[in-house]
Amino acid sequence: MSDVNAHLLAQRIDTVLDILVAGDYHSAIHNLEILKAELLALAADDAEQQNQPKAPWEI
């Protein structure tokens, strides 16, 4: 299972909010898209690890 650092995630969301307050909507959306892609990649890695066949001694 991936280890999502809640503090780091909150900092990144805060950065996006600061960008929105500054009025740079394009950059804020771009940053959110990057964050979303990273989180989806983490989720895909988790799903891939969970779907690996177990060794006979793990069943």
Swiss-Prot record:
Domain of life: Bacteria
UniProt cross-references to Pfam families, sorted A to Z: YciZ
Family: Belongs to the UPF0509 family.
The name this protein goes by in its record: UPF0509 protein KPN78578_12530
Organism: Klebsiella pneumoniae subsp. pneumoniae (strain ATCC 700721 / MGH 78578)
